[in-house]
Swiss-Prot record:
The lineage of its organism: Viruses, Riboviria, Orthornavirae, Pisuviricota, Pisoniviricetes. Belongs to the alphacoronaviruses spike protein family. The keyword Metal-binding does not apply. It comes from Canine coronavirus (strain BGF10) (CCoV). This is Spike glycoprotein. It holds the Pfam family CoV_S2_C. The gene is S. Residues 1041-1160 are annotated as: Heptad repeat 1 (HR1).
Length: 1453
């Protein structure tokens, strides 16, 4: 690969061809071997049929160039003001297959796309490049290309897709026998590559200049080398091609007028009679019997299938005759077919503003019955005698009006009107219609042949006569003339017709329903005994001539009804079956009113009964229409409606009377085609095939199948929309199902071809035979699935390795037709905790978890518009095409909305496998997915706890209590003591009462003794007191001193004890009051917590309500849409088939038109609602993305964005059609009001400056002490400001800009006045129709009913709110209740029993123990003494059992 180096700046040149580079020289390519066949083969590429045509285009007929240079670098040349560019390979005569070629690059500039043709150096493929066979054409959006580094690797980056790459081969041994080139216009590009033509539909603005990159020695100047020659084409040229019996010849067409006319008007029909692509349709018009279409695209039946095209340069004066049957196609240009000819089209070409000679003097129409009608025009009003002289029908631009008449034998039968100023096409139908420039100028009886004489003179006129047949086609009309035709003759073309576009973009499209055609008639009626009545209606027409010879129906024409026994003019059906028959008689009269002659020639007339005002047609009465009552009358009295009776002549229709109808709807009587009287079940069923049915009065088209269902009630069963689902045969109880003949399917179209289709039934369609299954549908494709895996398995994205070209939701289709699923994006990485630190919460904040639901996507909806509106009815589908692109707009709006939403969702959402593992409670509460450092801790709901062991009090090993035996043996006295006084006293005395006074204790410096004294102490101190009293006189009073001291010490004990008790009581009271305050505060916090919980439940209920609304909105909308199918929109019925079964075609069209209008309105309302909802979801999806990034992945600094409070952290979880966020926020409970300052203005002498706070999150305020402080706005934490907190600004002036609302966009470019914008939209696009009311009904889609859960949450929230009110009352009661507590320390003292108690206990023990031992050892047969005695006696005595006397126990009860 030769490395290309070039730096290029492109400009647009206005000259024809830039030849400023002297390295490019002209080349005579005719000297190249084999070049004589280049033009011939090139021109005949698209002309395969036999015949003669003239083709025009930007063909290579100008100067060829070869560019080379001696330098080793590349250079470029610019061709400007051209419309096509061609290049060819030049090689030396001795070149071989190994000849070396130089790289070539051609860049065609345009906007928004450009074309690049790149050919690598011929020897080796570029490494890593796909097999391009050395050349590639690429469509790119890159306006500039880096030629310096241009390699094949860039193809993947600059080309728009695989559908915009065309590989080709350039081989030096071709020796100039192949031509390569590009021709472009604003609509498409034609690429001539490798003996083939590629048409690329590209709407583009071309700059008409080309940049050519060439290299050194690109001429064939040495052996084994090759070179290129180039040509830019700016002139339009014509070639005349002839293909006769395989012999091809061509010549340059130099007569511009002749060549232009021939190329514009003459073509060679392709096999099948189709007009080739690219034909201009000059002066071809769409035939219409009503108003003329001005512009637009329509699907219609038009005579565009050409059986023979006869190019006629000129006519002689002799008359020419053209017949519909037995036409001889001996002069056809191209193919000729033997199809039935419906319309003969005379296409006229003439020089502008030149009258075409004499034109045709008269058109003679040979109608049925041999009556010849002449059509001719006159330049002035004429008398009756003037009609005997021929007028004319001039072709071209005429000078003055022409008045046209229908003549018979020189008599004017009807005035037609004035001739158009310019006659360009005349078309005549075999059914009697005469069209001029597409408009139905005149209608008569069917026509057999046409004749006229014509001369073109010297006007340069050019004719074509086309024998055509009707076919369905998509016709594009501009200024009333046909511009483009797309035949609906294939599956892909049927989709084009249904979408009203000739160029299908890549995407999914509903498969157009095909016409059912003629099918069997199925009728289901109740068995009954039928009596039949044949009703014969006789109409006697009287025809005569007017003063000018026109046929006139006489007022004496008579209508006769059968007579009944009541002798009235009202005839009523008395049987339960009837059939109507009409007998028409025609008699003529001369100038009197005696009608006794037969109606011949132009007087021939037929009686026809038209629909009139009745909701059914007369000719449909015998088509199993049912009534409760049906009567005919010639008197309008009491009539419900009327039929119009007319006389149809060769020139017009004339009314002769009316038939009045009196009827009641019901099922008692039925109209039948023939007599079926007697006991019959007239039901006729055609099973398992498409049939036109009438089932218990309900009409339609479908497939009837027998089922195994058993239904006890009902005769027929309908859906919500009113469609028939099934019925029951009352004779045997068998239930039959009714299904559509065709089901809706979605076709995948790529590059204008169908590569796959999705359908709900497993049946081949669209010519696709390979299929696979998915969980929701069957997929048929051109991709051969049977070669890859077993048919019928679920498609997986891993089965086929390809890049999808089109996507819809999570489904993608590749260019080869393979189906892939594309919506899952995997992410790697371990799940880590959001936070591992502790969060400190200030006291004036509370934590709240708030729930928020945001919708992220909507379920895509695809609607088959024509199926919804017409339900497959072919006539309705034709009427639907009159609504231009209504269905296409509806379907494309939904499809494009779904594609856009799918692209946004695919780029937004991804799936983490590790996150999926934690999507259950068990996995979330498990330690398997934790980091190893956390696994050793217990896990409860994701929290790692250290256990509850620290909460329990620790055990004290030191023994502080007595045993149970001590409590039994001693009396326990409980008193109150002072600290450790009692314990120290007991330890000192050691239990000796004599040491009582010696062991006196001191408490706060005061001697004290325990207040409790036992008997020994009391006796001791009593004796001391008595001795002191007795010996007091003798000086022995000192004996009572111990008593006095002990008493005083004990009194001290009591006094100090009382003081301590008072202090303790005060301490306890204070502590208890403080405890009550804490309890009050705790209850207040509980109250706040319950209040917050109540608010939290309210937010959860609100979020769930929003989820329910989101999930059910689409189902409700679809339900509304389905219900509209029951609405008849003021038509006589909501069933299209029933309308066509009851009315004639024209009357039924008017009724069906109402249904179409109403249903399209309902569809528009649904689409508008869907698109509005998608716009809302698109905005909420962006909001969800912002919340994930700001709330979940980080901590938001915006107050209220992530919950209503200061954001801590958020969690996100999936919810139906969206995401639900759990925001943990801080809610302030107390506020401090300050006056904030935006800055400080200071002055220093003559200088004034300002200071503003640097950190916008800080607020400057002045406190009550007139000092300035700074505090964060998130929490009140005032601090003294420092100089580093401020930024100095130049001045203190504040500038305000006064502007109006109109001037705001110039200041703020993205400013939008929402209110004014909405008002403008409403004013400019106010509809002139009323959208129907769409009631809410249950639809058979997924319906999420959370009403009960939401009501329960709201009830619980209300209950919690009431609980907070009750707690507030209880808190007030607690605050008003403070109890004064009294409590004394408990001192336990054990007192020993007296000595005589112990003496009594010892005596009892001494007496009772010997007595108990004696009783146990001496009594009973087994007593110890008895046993010893028996043993001793047995050892000394021979009789062992004589001395033994058993002692029996006597038990007395």
């Amino acid at each position: 690969m030769i490395v290309l180096t070039l730096c290029l700046f492109l400009v647009l040149y206005n000259s024809v061809i830039c030849t400023s580079n002297n390295e490019c020289v002209q080349v005579n390519v005719t000297q190249l071997p084999g070049n004589e066949n280049i033009i011939r083969d090139f021109l005949f590429q698209n002309f395969k049929e036999e015949g003669t045509v003239v083709v025009g285009g930007y063909y290579p007929t100008e100067v060829w160039y070869n560019c080379s240079r001696t330098a080793r670098t590349q250079a470029f040349k610019t061709f400007s003001n051209i419309h096509a560019f061609y290049f060819d390979m030049e090689a030396m005569e001795n070149s071989t297959g190994d000849a070396r070629g130089k790289p070539l690059l051609v860049h065609v500039h345009g906007n928004p796309v450009s074309i690049i043709v790149y050919i690598s150096a011929y020897r080796h493929d570029v490494q890593g490049r796909p097999k391009l066979k050395h050349g590639l054409l690429c469509i790119t959006k890159n306006s500039t290309t880096d030629y310096d580094r241009f390699t094949a690797n860039q193809w993947r980056d600059i080309c728009l897709g695989e559908d915009r790459k065309i590989p080709f081969s350039v081989v030096p041994t071709d020796n100039g026998t192949k031509l390569f080139g590009l021709e472009w216009n604003d609509d498409y590009v034609t690429a001539y590559i490798s003996d083939d033509s590629h048409y690329l539909n590209i709407n583009n603005n071309w700059f008409n200049n080309v940049t050519l990159l060439y290299s050194r020695s690109s001429t064939a100047t040495w052996q084994h080398s090759a070179a290129y020659v180039y040509q830019g084409v700016s002139n339009f040229t014509y070639y005349k091609l002839n293909n006769t019996n395989g012999l091809k010849s061509y010549e340059l067409c130099e007569d511009y007028e002749y060549c232009t006319g021939y190329a514009t008007n003459v073509f060679a029909p392709t096999p099948g009679g189709y007009i080739p692509e690219g034909f201009s349709f000059n002066n071809w018009f769409m035939l219409t019997n009503s108003s003329t279409f001005v512009s637009g695209r329509f699907v219609t039946n038009q005579p565009l299938l050409v059986n023979c095209l006869w190019p006629v340069p000129s006519f002689g004066v002799a008359a020419q005759e053209f017949c519909f049957e037995g036409a001889q196609f001996s002069q056809c240009n191209g193919v000729s077919l033997n199809n039935t000819v419906d319309v003969i089209r005379f296409n006229l070409n003439f020089t502008t503003d030149v009258q075409s000679g004499m034109g045709a003097t008269v058109f003679s129409l040979n109608t049925t019955g041999g009556v010849i009608l002449d059509i001719s025009c006159y330049n002035d009003t004429v008398s009756e005698s003037s009609f005997y002289s021929y007028g004319e029908i001039p072709f071209g631009v005429i000078d003055g009006p022409r008045y046209c008449y229908v003549l018979y034998n020189g008599t004017a039968l009807k005035y037609l009107g004035t001739l158009p100023p310019s006659v360009k096409e005349i078309a005549i139908s075999k059914w009697g219609h005469f069209y001029i420039n597409g408009y139905n100028f005149f209608s008569t009886f069917p026509i057999d042949c046409i004749s006229f004489n014509l001369t073109t003179g010297a006007s340069g006129a050019f004719w074509t006569i086309a024998y055509t047949s009707y076919t369905e086609a998509l016709v594009q009309v501009e200024n009333t003339a046909i511009k483009k035709v797309t035949y609906c003759n294939s599956h892909v073309n049927s989709i084009k017709c249904s979408q009203l576009t000739a160029n299908l973009q890549n995407g999914f499209y509903p498969v157009a329903s095909s016409e059912v055609g003629l099918v069997n008639k199925s009728v289901v009626l109740l068995p009954s005994f039928y009596s039949h009545t044949s009703v014969n209606i006789t109409i006697d027409l009287g025809m005569r001539r007017s003063g000018y010879g026109q046929p006139v129906a006489s007022s004496l024409s008579n209508i006769s009804l059968p007579m009944q026994d009541n002798n009235t003019d009202v005839y009523c059906i008395r049987s339960n079956q009837f059939s109507f028959y009409v007998h028409s008689n025609c008699k003529s009269a001369s100038w009197d009113n005696i009608f006794n002659s037969a109606c011949t020639d132009v007087l021939e007339a037929t009686a026809v009964i038209k629909t009139g005002t009745c909701p059914f047609s007369f000719d449909k009465l015998n088509n199993y229409l049912t009534f409760n009552k049906f009567c005919l009358s010639l008197n309008p009295t009491g009539a419900n409606c009327k039929f119009d009776v007319v006389a149809r002549t060769r020139t017009n229709e004339q009314g002769v009377g009316s038939l009045y109808v009196i009827y009641e709807e019901g099922d008692n009587i039925v109209g039948v085609p023939s007599d079926n009287s007697g006991l019959h079940d007239l039901s006729v069923l055609h099973l398992d095939s498409c049939t036109d049915y009438n089932i218990y009065g309900r009409n339609g088209v479908g497939i009837i199948r027998k089922t195994n269902s058993t239904l006890l009630s009902g005769l027929y069963y309908t859906s919500l929309s009113g469609d028939l689902l099934g019925f029951k045969n009352v004779s045997d109880g068998v239930v039959y199902s009714v299904t559509p003949c065709e089901v809706s399917a979605q076709a995948a179209v790529i590059d204008g071809a169908i590569v796959g289709a999705m359908t709900s039934i497993n049946s081949e369609l669209l010519g696709l035979t390979h299929w696979t299954t998915t969980p929701n549908f069957y997929y048929y494709s051109i991709y051969n699935y049977t070669n890859e895996r077993v048919r019928g398995t679920v498609t997986d994205s891993n089965d086929v390795d390809c890049e999808p070209i089109i996507t819809y939701s999570n489904i993608g289709v590749c260019k080869n037709g393979a189906l892939v699923f594309i919506n899952v994006t995997h992410s790697d990485g371990d799940v880590q905790p959001i936070s591992t630190g502790n969060v400190t919460i200030p006291t004036n904040f509370t934590i709240s978890v708030q729930v928020e639901y945001i919708q992220v996507y909507t379920t895509p909806v695809s609607i088959d518009c024509s199926r919804y509106v017409c339900n497959g009815n072919s006539r309705c589908n034709k009427l639907l095409t009159q609504y231009v692109s209504a269905c296409h707009t509806i379907e494309q709006a939904l499809a494009m909305g779904a594609r856009l939403e799918n692209m946004e969702i695919d780029s937004m959402l991804f799936v983490s496998e590790n996150a999926l593992k934690l999507a259950s409670v068990e996995a979330f509460n498990s330690t398997d997915n934790l980091d190893p450092i956390y696994r050793e801790w217990p896990n409860i709901g994701g929290s790692w706890l250290g256990g509850l062991k620290d909460i329990l009090p620790s055990h004290n090993s030191k023994r502080k209590y007595r045993s149970a035996i001590e409590d039994l043996l001693f009396d326990k006295v409980v008193t109150s003591g002072l600290g450790t006084v009692d314990e120290d006293y007991k330890r000192c005395t050691g239990g000796y009462d004599i040491a009582d006074l010696v062991c006196a204790q001191y408490y706060n410096g005061i001697m004290v003794l325990p207040g409790v004294a036992n008997d020994d102490k009391m006796a001791m101190y009593t004796a001391s007191l008595a001795g002191g009293i007795t010996l007091g006189a003798l000086g022995g009073g000192a004996v009572s001193i111990p008593f006095a001291v002990a008493v005083q010490a004990r009194l001290n004990y009591v006094a100090l004890q009382t003081d301590v008790l008072n202090k303790n009581q005060q301490i306890l009271a204070n502590a208890f009051n403080q405890a009550i305050g804490n309890i009050t505060q705790a209850f207040g916090n509980v109250n706040d917590a319950i209040h917050q919980t109540s608010k939290g439940l309210a937010t959860v209920a609100k979020a769930l309500a929003k989820v329910q609304d989101v999930v059910n909105t689409q189902g409700q909308a679809l339900s509304h849409l389905t219900v509209q199918l029951q609405n008849n929109f003021q038509a006589i019925s909501s069933s299209i088939s029933d309308i066509y079964n009851r009315l004639d075609e024209l009357s039924a069209d008017a009724q069906v038109d109402r249904l179409i209008t109403g249903r399209l309105t309902a569809l528009n309302a649904f689409v508008s609602q869907t698109l509005t909802r998608q716009a809302e979801v698109r905005a909420s999806r962006q909001l969800a993305k912002d919340k994930v990034n700001e709330c979940v992945r980080s901590q938001s600094q915006r107050f209220g964005f992530c919950g209503n409070g200061t954001h801590l952290f958020s969690l996100a979880n999936a919810a139906p059609n969206g995401m639900i966020f759990f925001h943990t926020v801080l809610l302030p409970t107390a506020y401090e009001t300050v006056t904030a300052w935006s800055g400080i203005c200071a002055s220093d002498g003559n200088r004034t400056f300002g200071l503003v706070v640097k950190d916008v999150q800080l607020t400057l305020f002045r406190n009550l002490d007139y000092k300035f402080y700074l505090t964060p706005r998130t929490m009140y934490q005032p601090r003294v400001a420092t100089s580093s907190d401020f930024v100095q600004i130049e001045g203190c002036d504040v500038l305000f800009v006064n502007a109006t609302v109109i001037e705001l966009p110039s200041i703020i470019p993205d400013y939008i006045d929402i209110n004014q914008t909405v008002q403008d939209i409403l004013e400019n696009f106010r509809p002139n129709w009323t959208v129907p009311e769409l009631p809410l009904d249950i639809f058979n889609a997924t319906y999420l009913n959370l009403t009960g859960e939401i009501n329960d949450l709201e009830f619980r929230s209300e209950k919690l709110h009431n609980t907070t009110l009750e707690l507030a009352t209880l808190i007030d009661n607690i605050n008003n209740t403070l109890v004064n507590l009294e409590w004394l320390n408990r001192i336990e003292t054990y007192v020993k029993w007296p000595w005589y108690v112990w003496l009594l206990i010892g005596l009892v023990v001494i007496f009772c123990i010997p007595l108990l031992l004696f009783c146990c050892c001496s009594t009973g047969c087994c007593g110890c003494f008895g046993c010893i005695g028996s043993c001793c006696h047995s050892m000394c005595s021979r009789r062992q059992f004589e001395s033994y006397e058993p002692i029996e126990k006597v038990h007395v009860h």
